[in-house]
Amino acid sequence: MSDRAKELEEAAASIDAASLDTARKGIVTGCQELIYWLELLSRRLEKVPPEKQHKFARAFSLIMLGHLPTRPGTCPFCVQYGQSRSCRGCGYATTHGRCDSDQSSFSLFIEAFSELGRAIYQDTGGLNCHPDDARLRLEHCIRSSRLLAADMMEDIDSLCTRELMERKARYLEQMIDLLPKELFGPEIMESWRRVHEMLRNYW
């Protein structure tokens, strides 16, 4: 085991069962809500005319981003060490920097993540591909993201803290990969790459 792996193992070992369970429930709630919206979007997609597909793609992307596990309630470290304890004793703060520090791993990720959402929201141009291709891409993105969210819910109960953080990082990466970035302008692709880069140090 590398020194870094040992540090992460030690950080995760400090989390108690109650905090881990609270974070699990927070993640599951987000997955359940996302699946609800994805099923709704799936039913509506077939009725979306070509001139509305770009707007639909933006809505899908923002709904997905808004339901990913990035909030404090989905992090066992934030649950245990946040609020009243002000991050004192937090193993994630020790290994990745305090989340309220501008240069911490989480701050750099959430800044890039928020910028991606802003770029998608402000992308009001037209489709960058043929409407038929856009529809197929959206069908794939919705179907695949729904499966990933369901898998995440199924996996999460049996995971320890270290495994949960690893699984969450992988889930974030997989879901962000399913954004229909090909349908948007070049700024979205650049923002997407930045999020990917910041995810390398998420855990």
What does each model-identified segment do?
Residues S2-W203:
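Cysteine-centered metal-binding/redox modules
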